[in-house]
Curated annotation (Swiss-Prot):
Membrane topology field: Multi-pass membrane protein
Tissue expression as described in the entry: Expressed abundantly in brain and pancreas. Also expressed in the testis.
Subunit organization: Binds to TIPF39/TIP39.
Glycosylation (residues): N51, N106, N116, N121
Main location: membrane
Matching PROSITE patterns: G_PROTEIN_RECEP_F2_1, G_PROTEIN_RECEP_F2_2, G_PROTEIN_RECEP_F2_3, G_PROTEIN_RECEP_F2_4
Role noted for this protein: This is a specific receptor for parathyroid hormone. The activity of this receptor is mediated by G proteins which activate adenylyl cyclase. PTH2R may be responsible for PTH effects in a number of physiological systems. It may play a significant role in pancreatic function. PTH2R presence in neurons indicates that it may function as a neurotransmitter receptor.
Name of the protein this chain belongs to: Parathyroid hormone 2 receptor
Annotated region described as Disordered, given as residue ranges: 511-550
Length: 550
């Protein structure tokens, strides 16, 4: 098993290293800023001017080569259409298409007097204007939008209910559940920030805006023009910053959950209360530091639009810490699975059912995948492509797990938690008992005996005690013994003794002699210490730290 653990560690580090290396070579969103786009256009313009000078020296032609602001057009032939591939330096262009120009018989390019510029056909380059492509892409993104909107909404609702449940029961107040609640809040804030960002941020540069920026005679002026009126982007910049911050906090609270579970397994005498504030600092404080650094760098070096588009290497200020959290969580996951496999191997050595143990390992591993966010490392390792069926499948899977992860986490940490279920059952039993007691008539009425009958329908244990009580009341001596039996409510979990219950005992108990009543009083005094004392809620309700997950 030592060799198995070592191989798991080596395999994990190799996989993590290759994934992070592949991630470092690719842009997370595959987009560029306006400034980066303009720089590429300026470089193409300089190269085109050099080519034009060389072509003019070769001799006269029919239509002169020229730069139109987007494409460097070569020398044209009289009366024919010139076709040039769509330039690869324009991000939004269809790089597999071509642009067209027509050379007139008089040796000049077609000119549109209404627009005061040379005519050119870029319809094949503008891929999002093609009906067959735009309709399919629009439907695809609409499906994604509906899917992750439903997912984040379900996650938000389930997490809100889980927080109310854990916060309501004092017996569930402990460090482990406090960490769970912080994780729930981070998922809810992540969902909220996504909804807000979708409403206030424009995701793409429009065609008209692109043309207005790069179709100028001097594109360098457009860089300065983009910085003239920035007040209109303040709201969406704040939305983007908050989205990145809550996204980072969500990743780091998942890391905190992994660290906490790992310490419970591997650290002897682990004091969870002592490290709670440290976990809070990791989950909320550390992401605030590098997100603030990114915001300052973006405002200083690339203050364009809403900051929703990538700005070169500035993005690594917040992406590198997030990738580090994902990688560290993956290592903790491998180490935890290694311990589980070791325990199962040792259990099999003493003759347990092998298939049952491996099913238990598979179940625990599946739960740990969601708890540690292992699916993030899978999506990081996948190659980034923005076309084809593989990309569409990847987008569906990634957005599905990202949006529904909060729902899965709430099920694991709250709704399937044995302690939470026990507390809910206790509250339900108390509520049923209170309803039954309110429906019974006063004890002084003729139907006072029905009180005992009503209570017997609440729990099966009470029905047995009531039946035996009726039998022993017939004989005088047996009635004294029955009166000394502990009250059936004491057997209910979480039951709290109430003095009002003595007022609803059947009349037959009060018809005993003074001697018997004195003995009964002594017996009751002796029985009271046997009732379960209410223990500290901070410790009693939070036992078994690892059983809920493993």
């Amino acid at each position: 098993m030592a060799g198995l653990g070592a191989s798991l560690h080596v395999w994990g580090w190799l996989m993590l290293g290759s994934c992070l290396l592949a991630r470092a070579q690719l842009d997370s969103d595959g987009t560029i800023t306006i400034e980066e786009q303009i720089v590429l256009v300026l470089k193409a313009k300089v190269q085109c001017e050099l080519n034009i000078t060389a072509q003019l020296q070769e001799g006269e032609g029919n239509c002169f080569p020229e730069w139109d602001g987007l494409i460097c057009w070569p020398r044209g032939t009289v009366g024919k259409i010139s076709a040039v591939p769509c330039p690869p330096y324009i991000y939004d262009f269809n790089h597999k298409g071509v642009a067209f120009r027509h050379c007139n018989p008089n040796g000049t390019w077609d000119f549109m007097h209404s627009l005061n510029k040379t005519w050119a056909n870029y319809s094949d380059c503008l891929r999002f204007l093609q009906p067959d492509i735009s309709i399919g892409k629009q439907e695809f993104f609409e499906r994604l939008y509906v899917m992750y909107t439903v997912g984040y909404s379900i996650s938000f609702g389930s997490l809100a209910v889980a927080i109310l449940i854990i916060g309501y029961f004092r017996r569930l107040h402990c460090t482990r559940n406090y960490i769970h609640m912080h994780l729930f809040v981070s998922f809810m804030l992540r969902a909220t920030s996504i909804f807000v960002k979708d409403r206030v941020v424009h995701a793409h540069i429009g065609v008209k805006e692109l043309e207005s920026l790069i179709m100028q005679d001097d594109p360098q002026n457009s860089i300065e023009a983009t910085s003239v009126d920035k007040s209109q982007y303040i709201g969406c910049k704040i939305a983007v910053v908050m989205f990145i911050y809550f996204l980072a906090t969500n990743y780091y609270w998942i890391l905190v959950e992994g660290l906490y579970l790992h310490n419970l397994i591997f650290v002897a005498f682990f004091s969870d209360t002592k490290y709670l504030w440290g976990f809070i600092l990791i989950g909320w404080g550390f992401p605030a530091a590098f997100v603030a650094a990114w915001a300052v760098a973006r405002a200083t070096l690339a203050d364009a639009r809403c900051w929703e588009l990538s700005a070169g290497d500035i993005k690594w200020i917040y992406q590198a810490p997030i990738l580090a959290a994902i990688g560290l969580n993956f290592i903790l996951f491998l180490n935890t699975v290694r311990v589980l496999a070791t325990k199962i191997w040792e259990t099999n050595a003493v003759g347990h059912d092998t298939r049952k143990q491996y099913r238990k390992l598979a179940k625990s591993t599946l739960v740990l995948v969601l708890v540690f966010g292992v699916h993030y490392i899978v999506f990081v390792c996948l190659p980034h492509s923005f076309t084809g069926l593989g990309w569409e499948i990847r987008m569906h899977c990634e957005l599905f797990f990202n949006s529904f992860q909060g729902f899965f986490v709430s099920i694991i940490y709250c709704y399937c938690n044995g302690e939470v279920q026990a507390e809910v059952k206790k509250m339900w039993s108390r509520w049923n008992l209170s309803v039954d007691w309110k429906r019974t008539p006063p004890c002084g009425s003729r139907r006072c005996g029905s009180v005992l009958t009503t209570v017997t329908h609440s729990t099966s244990s009470q029905s047995q005690v009531a039946a035996s009580t009726r039998m022993v009341l017939i004989s005088g001596k047996a009635a004294k013994i029955a009166s000394r039996q502990p009250d059936s409510h004491i057997t209910l979990p979480g039951y709290v003794w109430s003095n009002s219950e003595q007022d609803c005992l059947p009349h037959s108990f009060h018809e005993e002699t003074k001697e018997d009543s004195g003995r009964q009083g002594d017996d009751i005094l002796m029985e009271k210490p046997s009732r379960p004392m209410e223990s500290n809620p901070d410790t009693e309700g939070c036992q078994g730290e690892t059983e809920d997950v493993l």
